């Protein structure tokens, strides 16, 4: 279920504070965060945010198409390990 419109989107306070400070100064540094549940707002467009996936911080450049989504949607937490594809002759 989507979040109630009455409540508004969730954004971590520390992340919003860093974005506002960088917008005021005009800087474009990489912002590291662990908040995967934060919603991407229009004020974040143009910034690079490094989101933690459990092992490392993965940088995401925020563009117009990402507004309204969560930060965690673009950073996978699980690595896919496929099975080794071998020849049919070796299985016999």
Curated annotation (Swiss-Prot):
Which Gene Ontology cellular component annotation is one that this UniProt entry carries? chloroplast
SUPFAM superfamilies associated with the record = Ribosomal protein S19
Q: Name one GO molecular function term.
A: rRNA binding
| PROSITE patterns referenced in this protein's UniProt entry, alphabetically | RIBOSOMAL_S19
Which UniProt keywords are present, listed alphabetically?
Chloroplast, Plastid, Ribonucleoprotein, Ribosomal protein, RNA-binding, rRNA-binding
Location in the cell reads: Plastid, Chloroplast
- Pfam families hit by this protein: Ribosomal_S19
- UniProt superkingdom: Eukaryota
Where does this protein chiefly localize? plastid
Coiled coil, from the record: none
Q: Which GO terms describe its biological process?
A: ribosomal small subunit assembly; translation
NCBIfam families, per this entry? rpsS_bact
Q: Which family does it belong to?
A: Belongs to the universal ribosomal protein uS19 family.
Sum up the protein's function in the record's words.
Protein S19 forms a complex with S13 that binds strongly to the 16S ribosomal RNA.
- The molecule here is called Small ribosomal subunit protein uS19c
